[in-house]
């Protein structure tokens, strides 16, 4: 009996072992640190370094999960800071933030938007933002629409560029760095009129379909339903 027939027999007799889905959580929102309000519900950036969106996504490796900290410019979709770590400590988030801050013009006032995870609410992280003239914005609940651009960038990286599983974090780190370079300098976006992030990053003014304010539209639609 071949493999396919064998598995078909197991399936018919309900003897296949159901694959267990392992959920990996990257947001630790139960903490005592201050939670900041959402400042970007109806905000549309018109140039780079006006709004950054931050998020964490897990990267599977054979040894253990690694965690990719990302900071993306919402105007250009360019990833301006990233760090791959084998933990979700505040210090790992700060590594990504420092890379982004190194690119920020000294006189720019940036809104840094994230979820309410401990990595972003911690005193060390928020102090660093305030020291560099950054305003702090956070999601108000678990709705992914409140950080839609960050979620979209995660999806692009993981479905188009990043491997399904790496041998270890070191291998992952080297490959992901190359993937982000490809994303920034070669990957075209329909939301940027098919331009690349690196090119848009040097522009100013509205972009064609450049940033849909998903949360604002969703909130407005919900309000209309309630009032009708």
What are these regions (language model features)?
Residues 78-82, 136-139, 163-164:
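Short small-residue beta-strand/loop micro-motif enriched in glycine and branched aliphatics
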């Amino acid at each position: 009996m071949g493999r396919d027939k064998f598995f078909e027999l197991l399936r018919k007799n309900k003897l296949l072992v159901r694959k267990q889905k392992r959920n990996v959580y990257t947001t630790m929102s139960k903490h005592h640190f201050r939670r900041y309000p959402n400042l970007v519900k109806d905000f549309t950036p018109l140039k780079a370094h006006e709004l950054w969106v931050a998020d964490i996504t897990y990267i599977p490796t054979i040894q253990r999960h690694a965690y990719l900290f990302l900071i993306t410019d919402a105007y250009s979709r360019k990833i301006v800071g990233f760090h791959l770590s084998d933990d979700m400590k505040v210090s790992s988030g700060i590594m990504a933030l420092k890379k982004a801050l190194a690119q920020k013009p000294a006189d720019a006032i940036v809104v840094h938007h994230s979820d309410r995870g401990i990595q972003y609410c911690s005193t060390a992280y928020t102090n660093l933002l305030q020291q560099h003239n950054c305003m702090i914005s956070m999601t108000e609940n678990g709705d992914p629409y409140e950080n839609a651009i960050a979620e979209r960038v995660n999806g692009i990286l993981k479905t188009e560029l990043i491997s399904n599983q790496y041998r270890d974090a070191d291998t992952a780190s080297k490959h992901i760095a190359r993937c982000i370079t490809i994303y920034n300098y070669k990957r075209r976006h329909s939301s940027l009129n098919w331009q690349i992030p690196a090119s848009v990053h040097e522009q100013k003014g509205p972009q064609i379909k450049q940033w849909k304010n998903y949360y604002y539209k969703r909130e407005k639609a919900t309000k209309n339903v309630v009032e009708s």
